[in-house]
């Protein structure tokens, strides 16, 4: 995703009444990295540094580094995938074989799940419960919809995601990615869900 494409994307999103603030500065990006342990892949970084989407549902990163309430909101978004997993462990018998035998008590289950999730690629919140994989740190990572362990692809990459979420139509010259990149753990959860459905 280049600057021209980002500018066009922002223009189309504004036509859908998405509000934007001035883009994040290099200093703000560094603070986000320091406060939340997030390194934005370059396509997302380019978008956020060009103009920052601030409509309801979007992550207001600037607010998150300038207020305790904003920081808590971002931490809640970052913890959403774990909280959803824990809900399914407690209420829906979710457990992965590779984690070993499932302990009988929830406190032990929670500890194992937390430890296992910290080993996986970090998910960066974009909008509502949509997340971009932070790994690998490169352009073109898929966007996931995460609701408990009901995880699906919501975009093969960032551009594809915005067309799906907001019904915008990008010029054909932008090109498309035919299938999403495989992301350790998260893509496996989608495959697992598909097996259950089949």
Question: Can you describe what each PLM-predicted range is?
Answer:
Residues 120-122, 140:
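Residues that flank catalytic or metal-binding motifs in active/ligand-binding sites
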Residues 129-133:
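Extended serine/threonine-enriched, polar tracts that run as long, contiguous segments within proteins
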Residues 108-112, 134-142:
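A short secondary-structure junction signal
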């Amino acid at each position: 995703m280049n600057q021209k494409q980002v500018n066009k994307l922002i223009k189309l999103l504004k036509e859908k009444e998405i509000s934007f603030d001035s883009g994040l500065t290099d200093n703000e990006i560094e603070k986000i990295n320091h406060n939340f342990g997030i390194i934005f892949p370059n396509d997302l970084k380019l978008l956020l540094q060009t103009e920052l989407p601030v409509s309801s549902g979007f992550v207001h990163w600037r607010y998150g580094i300038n207020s305790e309430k904003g920081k808590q909101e971002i931490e809640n978004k970052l913890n959403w995938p774990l909280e959803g997993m824990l809900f399914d462990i407690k209420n829906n018998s979710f457990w992965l074989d590779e984690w070993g035998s499932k302990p009988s008590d929830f406190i032990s289950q929670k500890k194992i799940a937390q430890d296992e999730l910290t080993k996986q690629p970090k998910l960066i919140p974009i909008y509502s419960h949509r997340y971009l994989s932070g790994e690998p740190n490169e352009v073109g990572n898929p966007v996931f919809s995460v609701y408990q362990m009901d995880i699906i692809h919501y975009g093969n990459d960032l551009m594809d995601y915005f067309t799906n979420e907001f019904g915008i139509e990008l010029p054909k010259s932008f090109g498309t990615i035919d299938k999403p990149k495989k992301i350790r753990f998260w893509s496996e959860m989608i495959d697992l869900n598909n097996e259950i459905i089949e």
